[in-house]
Amino acid sequence: MEGNAKVIAVTGKGGVGKTSLAAGVVRRLTQRYPDAKILAIDADPAVGLATALDAKVKETLDDIRLEITQGVSEKLKDTQDILSEARFRLLDMMDEEKGFAFVAIGRPESSGCYCAINSYLRDVISMLAGQFDYVVIDGEAGIEQVNRRVMEQVTHLLLVTDQSRKGLQVIQTIKDVADRLVMYERLGVAVNRITQDVIPFGNPFPDAPFVEIRNDEAQIVNDIQGKSVFELPEECELLKGADGILDALGI
């Protein structure tokens, strides 16, 4: 990976609020570093980050991947020409409003394995990271993308859980896989949506910073009303959590 981009991957079990936290991190980065080049990647086929950031999705990575595959297989153009055109379209498709660029993985039309799009996503992360100062990736729930080395060039890995044992087990599994396959420099743990004063477990990784984020009524209302993270009040729990995450990761 070229350059010194900080690539932050937000991972965890589905339903723990990682997409909202990823959006909060993007908002805080735009505020802390207004002159920096920031890229948000929605790597979850559910496409929740686009909604959370109110980002326009012109095309998705899967749209471009399909055209590359078709062009190469049908030999419509020289392979290098196709790849060069794909790179140009990738840069052109990125929404760069609100102080950040945005790319979505998309949802493959065919059912079954996401191997092809995950492989393409890995290459895209490697290519784009050198052109940005900060990259925030909202990963697919679970370990699939980590296991397929989509995240192998991530520099900062954030593990998000709630107060449940299942959420804890998922981030423990993600860390086990990431320790073998991801070249991360810093690791952080965020316990999100805390509704009780006592968390039923301590920091599972004593060497990693541990951020506690209380349940956020403002963010819940925001979601119900279909508003973006940029419409949340400055002092809400979600944005306090995003600040804590960036501080914990040394960003």
Predicted features along the sequence, with ranges:
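Hydrophobic anchor at the beta1->P-loop junction of P-loop NTPases
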Residues: 10
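Walker A (P-loop) phosphate-binding loop of P-loop NTPases
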Residues: 15
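Conserved lysine of the Walker
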Residues: 18
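Hydrophobic positions on the alpha1 helix immediately C-terminal to the Walker A/P-loop
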Residues: 21
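N-terminal phosphate/diphosphate-binding loop that engages ATP/GTP or pyrophosphate donors
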Residues: 28-96
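Conserved catalytic-core segment of NTP-binding enzymes
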Residues: 31-34, 116-221
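Cytosolic-facing regulatory segments adjacent to core modules
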Residues: 83-97, 101-137
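C-terminal boundary of histidine-terminating zinc-finger modules
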Residues: 223-236
